[in-house]
């Protein structure tokens, strides 16, 4: 099925590209999410008329994500306190939700879906590097310090 991409899709294409994808992927994911439209003559003409507007919107989203990444990098570290045992293991764990709340409390708005924990939830005290994916192309990292209450 031929579709026109309205957003940059990893491993597929950029804004405005006409790509051939499987029908189910287009019908069940790309089109309902607003990431693509079917490549009919009417849609192609409509897209060409709106191309500059859509590309400006994508560029604005990218610039906003880069600005937030710079703010996160400027924080250097965020401290989270949690109950822990004698050997430095936490009672429970620190998940993406707690990290997102701590960074938001520090002054930078972050959603929990933007936090990437490569090894799963944090279960020990100490310093941990946490990565953030704020946009398809914008990544940053932050040091999270977990201390005992």
Curated annotation (Swiss-Prot):
GO biological-process terms attached to the record: translation
Keyword check for Ribonucleoprotein: yes
DNA-binding listed as a keyword: no
Signal peptide (UniProt feature, chain positions): none
GO molecular function, one term: rRNA binding
Gene Ontology cellular-component terms listed: ribonucleoprotein complex; ribosome
Keyword terms, alphabetized: Ribonucleoprotein, Ribosomal protein, RNA-binding, rRNA-binding
InterPro entries given in the database record: Ribosomal_bL9, Ribosomal_bL9/RNase_H1_N, Ribosomal_bL9_bac/chp, Ribosomal_bL9_C, Ribosomal_bL9_C_sf, Ribosomal_bL9_N, Ribosomal_bL9_N_sf
Coiled-coil intervals, chain numbering: none
Function: Binds to the 23S rRNA.
Family per similarity comment: Belongs to the bacterial ribosomal protein bL9 family.
Descriptive protein name: Large ribosomal subunit protein bL9
Organism of this sequence: Mannheimia succiniciproducens (strain KCTC 0769BP / MBEL55E)
């Amino acid at each position: 099925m031929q579709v026109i991409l309205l957003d940059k899709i990893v491993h597929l294409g950029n804004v405005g590209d006409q790509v051939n994808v499987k029908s189910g992927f287009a019908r069940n994911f790309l089109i309902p999410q607003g990431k693509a439209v079917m490549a009919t003559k009417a849609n192609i003409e409509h897209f060409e008329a709106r191309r500059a507007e859509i590309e400006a919107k994508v560029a604005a989203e990218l610039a906003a994500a880069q600005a937030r990444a710079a703010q996160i990098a400027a924080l250097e570290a965020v401290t989270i306190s949690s109950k822990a045992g004698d050997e430095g293991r936490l009672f429970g764990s620190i998940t993406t939700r707690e990290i997102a709340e701590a960074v938001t409390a520090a002054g930078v708005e972050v959603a929990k879906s933007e936090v990437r924990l490569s090894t799963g939830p944090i279960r020990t005290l100490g310093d941990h590097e946490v990565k953030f994916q704020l946009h398809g192309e914008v990544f940053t990292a932050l040091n999270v310090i977990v201390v005992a209450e």
